[in-house]
């Protein structure tokens, strides 16, 4: 049984929910499990978009369960999950992510139902750790002075960080209460080990969205001196650092352009602007960069892939990450890459062999490595080729699903 915070395509269709805009990597893994004859697949989704209460939808050998738990108390949430557990009686309770309260509630429900030994938690991001880096590189002025939009929505930078800290407390309780976690980087292993030194850590790499396995980046087909980033809308994605790097490069590369996918919060102006957006707008104006920035909006998997292939370099300027899927996607396409050396990124990419890693708060280093790629086509090709070879091993679909099932078997046999 899986507990997730976003539906797969199959779940969305069966439960009349909107198509998922995120979590495409979950689709790849769930599809593999649903096609196996030796697996009965149960998918549990807390969502305010479902009908009230608990709903069960059966399709073939799968069961999709939605719970509308909006504004529910902790006790109500735990009771709802307990109801599901006692009806389904799963062999494995696989919780994807620790970022949300429902993960904590499921562990409590499992404890009350005497099923704690069946629980395994996959590490995605670790919000308690992310909170420590949330304001990285943001001047105090913009941290302390909320925008009009922030005041109206009660959504200041400080509140965003405080919310991560609060969720981090539930996260700690979740990790302290489980015997098994699944991770994939030295960073998540270290963070989990600090919280629960006795936990059994199982290694399992992620599988990417299907479309990224079928294409390869080519210099001849890209827009020269173009950079692609996958997100920019909140501080930890480090867009402000990229702007400073581009400012250092624009005179040397007059045709440099940056393409940005995802939410556009950081680019909105006027009363819609966030405090972080105001800082971004200040940098754009200061360095005269507006004509070089191109916002693409939310892209589906195929559109993302095409933008990767059209761009000369992929940059991941985040101030903290575990193992960003966008980096894996760029690697498996064989792109030239520059990424901030934060969190678990160095578990994915080898500096100088598969791309370049740099100190996250040093935009001058980011600018330097971008120029190293722009100026050396052969180096771009060699780094991209090595990155692709590494990513094909890391994101091997058959190997990853086999190892995941082995983890499930080991947990069940241990009991």
Mark where each language-model region is.
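Short alpha-helical donor nucleotide-sugar binding micro-motif in glycosyltransferases
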Residues: 85, 306-311
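Nucleotide-activated donor-binding/catalytic signature segment of Leloir-type glycosyltransferases, i.e.
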Residues: 272-299
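Short hydrophobic beta-strand element within catalytic cores of glycosyltransferases
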Residues: 336-339
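Membrane-proximal helix-turn-helix segments that form the acceptor-binding/catalytic region
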Residues: 127, 143-180, 190, 194, ...
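Conserved donor-binding/catalytic core segment of Leloir-type glycosyltransferases
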Residues: 1, 218-237, 243-248, 258-261
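Aromatic "clamp/platform" in nucleotide-sugar-dependent glycosyltransferases that forms part
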Residues: 319
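Conserved acidic donor-binding segment of nucleotide-sugar-dependent glycosyltransferases
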Residues: 351-352, 356-363, 372-378
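N-terminal subdomain of nucleotide-sugar transferases
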Residues: 1-52, 58-62, 114-115
């Amino acid at each position: 049984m899986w507990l997730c915070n976003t539906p797969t395509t199959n779940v969305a269709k069966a439960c009349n929910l909107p198509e998922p805009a995120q979590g495409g990597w979950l689709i790849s893994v769930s599809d593999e499990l649903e096609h196996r004859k030796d697996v009965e697949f149960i998918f549990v989704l807390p969502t305010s978009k479902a009908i009230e209460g608990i709903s069960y939808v059966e399709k073939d050998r799968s069961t999709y369960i939605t719970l509308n738990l909006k504004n529910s108390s902790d006790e109500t949430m735990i009771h709802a999950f307990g109801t599901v557990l006692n009806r389904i009686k799963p062999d494995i309770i696989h919780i994807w992510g620790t970022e949300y309260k429902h993960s904590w509630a499921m562990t409590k429900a499992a404890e009350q139902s005497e099923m704690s030994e069946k629980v395994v938690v996959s590490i995605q991001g670790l919000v308690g750790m992310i909170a420590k880096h949330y304001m990285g590189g943001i001047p105090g002025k913009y941290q302390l002075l909320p925008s009009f939009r922030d005041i109206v929505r009660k959504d200041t930078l400080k509140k965003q960080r405080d919310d991560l800290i609060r969720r981090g407390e539930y996260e700690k309780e979740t990790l302290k209460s489980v015997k098994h976690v699944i991770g994939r980087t030295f960073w998540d292993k270290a963070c989990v080990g600090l919280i629960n030194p006795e936990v059994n850590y199982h290694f399992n790499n992620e599988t990417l969205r299907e479309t990224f396995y079928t294409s390869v980046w080519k210099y001849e087909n890209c827009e020269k001196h173009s950079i692609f980033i996958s997100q920019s809308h909140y501080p930890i994605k480090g867009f402000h650092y990229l702007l400073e790097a581009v400012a250092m490069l624009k005179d040397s590369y007059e045709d440099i352009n940056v393409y940005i996918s995802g939410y556009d919060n950081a680019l909105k102006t006027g009363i819609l602007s966030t405090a972080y957006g105001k800082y971004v707008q200040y940098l754009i104006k200061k360095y005269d960069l507006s004509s070089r920035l191109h916002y693409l909006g939310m892209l589906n998997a195929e559109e993302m892939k095409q933008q990767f292939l059209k761009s000369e370099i992929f940059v991941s300027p985040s101030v903290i990450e575990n193992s960003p899927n966008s980096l894996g996607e760029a690697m498996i396409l064989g792109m030239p890459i520059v990424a901030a050396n934060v969190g678990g990124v160095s578990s994915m990419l080898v500096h100088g062999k598969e791309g370049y890693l740099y100190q996250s708060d040093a935009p001058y280093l980011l600018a330097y490595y971008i120029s190293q790629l722009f100026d050396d086509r052969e180096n771009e090709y060699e780094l991209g080729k090595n990155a692709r070879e590494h990513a094909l091993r890391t994101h091997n679909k058959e190997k990853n699903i086999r190892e995941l099932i082995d983890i499930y078997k080991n947990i069940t046999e241990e009991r």
